[in-house]
Amino acid sequence: MAIERTFSMIKPDATKRNLTGAITKIFEDNGLRVIASKRVWMSKREAEGFYAVHKERPFFGELVDGMTSGPTVVQVLEGEGAILKNREIMGATNPANAAEGTIRKIHALSIGENSVHGSDAPETAAVEIAYWFSETEIVG
């Protein structure tokens, strides 16, 4: 498999419970390197822009409110097959359906407070990484 980069976000429900280190350790223990990371408090405008693809969905307002409720850690992860590997490590969006040992099974509170976000494809990874990081902030 090729070395890839993917975008990862540790959401406010997890940062409020001081889980940043525990979640990052899971990524690293599974062969992903953190090559960029910063802690941000999303503005409403940033959250609406980042999640614009969901704008017409009924949960959009609740999503924006949740993402602006506390600090978020945005990261770029790198490794072999990083996009798929990250998705496997995170587990299903709904923690009730997540496999044992995944981040969401271990740490998520609900489908709305599911602790992490990760890119689903190379194209979305590129867009999401560029949304939060300049090239000089990514140090591989």
Swiss-Prot record:
EC number, UniProt record: 2.7.4.6
InterPro entries cross-referenced by the UniProt entry: NDK-like_dom, NDK-like_dom_sf, Nucleoside_diP_kinase, Nucleoside_diP_kinase_AS
Cofactor(s) the protein requires to work: Mg(2+)
Residues the record marks as active site: 117
Assigned GO CC terms: cytoplasm
CDD domains in UniProt: NDPk_I (cd04413)
Catalytic activity: a 2'-deoxyribonucleoside 5'-diphosphate + ATP = a 2'-deoxyribonucleoside 5'-triphosphate + ADP; a ribonucleoside 5'-diphosphate + ATP = a ribonucleoside 5'-triphosphate + ADP
Molecular function GO terms recorded: ATP binding; metal ion binding; nucleoside diphosphate kinase activity
Cell location: Cytoplasm
One Pfam family cited in the UniProt record for this chain: NDK
Residues that bind ATP: 11, 59, 87, 93, 104, 114
Alphabetized UniProt keyword annotations: ATP-binding, Cytoplasm, Kinase, Magnesium, Metal-binding, Nucleotide metabolism, Nucleotide-binding, Phosphoprotein, Transferase
Source taxon at top rank: Bacteria
Annotated GO biological process: CTP biosynthetic process; GTP biosynthetic process; UTP biosynthetic process
Family note: Belongs to the NDK family.
Function according to Swiss-Prot or TrEMBL: Major role in the synthesis of nucleoside triphosphates other than ATP. The ATP gamma phosphate is transferred to the NDP beta phosphate via a ping-pong mechanism, using a phosphorylated active-site intermediate.
Oligomeric form and interacting partners: Homotetramer.
Protein name: Nucleoside diphosphate kinase
Biological source species: Rhizobium rhizogenes (strain K84 / ATCC BAA-868)
Gene behind this protein: ndk
